[in-house]
Design a protein with these regions (language model features):
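All-alpha RGS (Regulator of G-protein Signaling) helical domain and cognate RGS-like helical scaffolds
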Residues: 1-205
Length: 205
């Protein structure tokens, strides 16, 4: 994750490599009866400020919100492996944290606060017709493969967050980059755990 955090030109590669490495370690741990790598929830607990473009935080918040909505709807229908309300809630919490960071809405104790008129890019409801039509597996444009639907949602979230950072022109020196890289990497790792292909051919152009 250090590559992604301190070399913005390799943010995408470093983020996905981190998730890929954790997946490989998890595979080896399972094979040899060892404990899998500990991965904390994909949230921003304890982060109370962010010196990064608002556009980056907004785009990442939308990615979280979209994934949370999709997972929630699929969880309610009960036909999608890996789609749980707990996973949906984690996405929505991260989305709220990103919006709060963008608005600077933290009080002296570090708790989130709210003020009227603050910007919130989240739509809360999104078009997910393709997901509903393909609740078990779906064609993944990025990898060109058919993958488990919940895994596709997680990887789409990770890729959207990576794109938000890499397309920003003023976030290259931010000390938030390692934190944002870790967030996106956790979503990519979750995607692998849910069946998304981990080989390089599926991840890198």
């Amino acid at each position: 994750i250090h590559v992604a955090g301190y070399c913005s030109g390799r943010f995408a590669e470093g983020t996905l490599r981190d998730a890929q490495t954790k997946q490989w370690l998890a595979f080896l741990a399972d094979k040899f009866g060892q404990s899998a790598p500990e991965v904390t929830p994909a949230r921003l607990d304890g982060v109370t400020s962010a010196n990064v473009d608002r556009s980056v935080l907004d785009a990442m918040a939308v990615a979280e919100d979209r994934a949370g909505f999709a997972i929630e709807v699929l969880a309610a229908r009960g036909a999608t492996a890996g789609a749980t309300l707990a996973l949906s809630d984690m996405h929505k919490t991260a989305g709220q944290q990103l919006v709060a960071l963008a608005n600077g809405n933290f009080d002296d104790s570090g708790a989130q606060s709210s003020s009227p008129g603050q910007s919130d890019p989240r739509q809360k409801v999104y078009a997910i017709d393709q997901l509903l039509a393909n609740p078990t597996t779906i064609a993944d444009k990025a990898s060109g493969q058919t993958v488990p639907t919940a895994a596709a949602i997680e990887m789409d979230c990770a890729r959207a967050q990576i794109k938000a950072v890499t397309e920003s022109k003023s976030s290259t020196e931010s000390d938030m980059l390692p934190i944002l890289a870790a967030l996106a990497a956790k979503h990519a790792y979750t995607a692998f755990q849910l069946g998304y292909p981990a080989p390089d051919a599926a991840l890198f152009e």
